[in-house]
Structure formats: C-alpha cells, structure tokens
C-alpha cells in the first residue's frame, strides 16, 4: 500500500514540470487576443495530464526500489530458507491469481510492512519489510503477500494512473482559468496583451495547490481498493489469516512510521503519525477496524 504515496509524489513533481512547460511554450495555443480558448486549453491539459500520470506509473517500480532500499531476491539463488519460501509463496499466489511472477524483494524496516507496484500486472514488484519477516507467522505473511498480489491482479496501479491523469487534466485546466482571471482582474492585464510573469507564477502555484486538493479523489480510490485487495487476500490465503495479519498490524500501529512519506500509501500498514494529521479525506487507508469488519462479512473460508 505504499505504492500510491510514491505515485502521488512523482505525479505532483511531473505535474509541476508539465505545467511549467505548458506555461512557457504552449501558452500561445490556448491564449489569443480574445483571451482563453477553453476548448484548446482542455485538450492540451488532458494530453499533458495523462502523459504526466503515465510517466509516474512507468517510474513507480524503479522509484519504489530506490526509496525503500528494496533488495531484489535472485529467483535462481535465494540466500536462505526465508527467501526461498517467499519466492515459492509469491509464485504460487501469482499463479492462482492469473498473473506472471513479479519480482520479489525485501526492504529494511523494523515496522511490519509490504508493498506491490509496477506499471502492469505482469511486470510488478512485491516487497516485504524485515520486520514483517521477523514477527509474522507464515499464515499471516502469506495473507499479506496475497493482499499485495491482489493489488497487482486487480490492476490498481493502472486504474490509479487513469484516474490521476483525468485529475491532472482538470487541475491544469482550472489553474489556468483562475490564473487568467487573477491576471486580468488583479494585475490589470488588458485584452490583447500577452500573459506576464505574474500569470505564469500564479498558474504554477495553483497547479500545486489544486493538485494537493484533488488528491482527495485519488485517496478515495486508495481506500476503496484496500477492501478489494483484502478480499483478494482472504480468497487466496484464507479469511482468518487475513484478519489475523491485519490485527497484528493494528497492534503495531502505535509504532512511529518508518516508511518514507512518499511511499506510505503504497504500504499495507501505516504507523502512528507524529504531530499534525491530515483530515480523513486525505487518508490512504480505511481503519483496521473497518477492514476487519468488511472481511468478517465476506462469504469465504
């Protein structure tokens, strides 16, 4: 579940860069003597928004490895029984889920956590923390792996990219509409005059502000997909094992979160936040209680 935080951070960076390029080199295609050409602007923003989101998606696996320090297990030469068991279990779950074997890795973290990412379901990465390996029994660990395989099989990252691309398009569109309004009514730009530096500065700031606010839509999808991944984990590894794994994660919820901020939404668990906490609209996960309650209603062994 760390996958979305990384995706959002990368996407925001790409969105800002795309916005700068659009403002500097594309302004003439939607800004004329009569003001904004809203049709042209919407098309251009849609193209830039989708491209930015797809770049984030394509970079997600590489950035996940670098950000978490994930070390990939050589499928032909596991170094110990634990690594061999991980490879065997992921291979079995992947086959049952109907996807190709993903890369399997381990990242250093005392906190029990895991994530899956990748640009498509047949080119994915599943990684677990050292803390997860040390403190969960095999049934619980298998359930966590099944949960992550569920994310991959459900195509969550691709769906996220499509949602984020549409969100990006509207963020860039409204940033430029509002920026044009401010440039005319606050900075006094007259009809026929080219946008000045004030317009460019405003649109870049609005890209960031609107991008953060619009992430609430993506966070809603993140919360929704956790239930689906929990269900997949329960069907692949057993409902009680999935519930047991979640309850163990809940027992560690008072631990400070060691996951890099940009990876939190990719993780299966979030530790206790230190200091200010964002509103519920920006939470990447439902509560453990909500997830367990949903699993208990599930009709499966």
From Swiss-Prot:
One of its GO terms (cellular component) is plasma membrane. The chain crosses the membrane at residues 4-24, 38-58, 155-175, 200-220. One of its GO terms (molecular function) is zinc ion binding. Its main location: membrane. Binds 1 zinc ion per subunit. It is a multi-pass membrane protein. Belongs to the peptidase M48B family. This is Protease HtpX. It comes from Acinetobacter baylyi (strain ATCC 33305 / BD413 / ADP1). The gene is htpX.
């Amino acid at each position: 579940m760390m996958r979305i935080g990384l995706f959002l951070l990368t996407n925001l960076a790409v969105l800002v860069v795309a916005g700068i390029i659009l403002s500097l080199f594309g302004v003439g295609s939607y800004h004329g003597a009569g003001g904004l050409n809203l049709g042209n602007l919407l098309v251009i923003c849609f193209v830039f928004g989708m491209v930015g989101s797809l770049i984030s998606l394509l970079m997600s696996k590489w950035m996940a490895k670098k950000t978490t320090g994930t070390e990939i297990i050589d499928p032909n030469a596991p170094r110990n029984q634990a690594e061999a068991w991980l490879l065997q279990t992921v291979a079995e779950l992947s086959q049952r889920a109907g996807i190709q074997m993903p890369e399997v890795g381990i990242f250093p973290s005392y906190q029990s956590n895991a994530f899956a990412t990748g640009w498509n379901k047949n080119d994915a990465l599943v990684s677990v923390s050292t803390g997860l390996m040390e403190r969960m029994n095999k049934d619980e660990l298998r359930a966590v792996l099944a949960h992550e395989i569920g994310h991959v099989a459900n195509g969550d990252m691709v769906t996220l990219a499509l949602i984020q691309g549409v969100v990006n398009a509207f963020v860039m569109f409204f940033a430029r509409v509002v920026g044009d309004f401010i440039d005319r009514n606050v900075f006094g730009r007259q009809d026929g005059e080219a946008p000045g530096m004030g317009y460019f500065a405003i649109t870049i700031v609005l890209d960031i502000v609107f991008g953060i606010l619009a992430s609430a839509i993506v966070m809603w999808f993140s919360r929704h997909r956790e239930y689906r991944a929990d269900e997949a984990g329960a069907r692949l590894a057993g409902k009680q094992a999935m519930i047991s794994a979640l309850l163990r994660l809940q027992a560690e919820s008072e631990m400070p979160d060691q996951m890099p901020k940009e990876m939190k939404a990719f993780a299966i668990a979030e530790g206790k936040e230190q200091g200010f906490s964002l509103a519920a609209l920006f939470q990447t996960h439902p509560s453990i209680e909500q997830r367990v309650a949903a699993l208990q209603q599930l009709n499966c062994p």
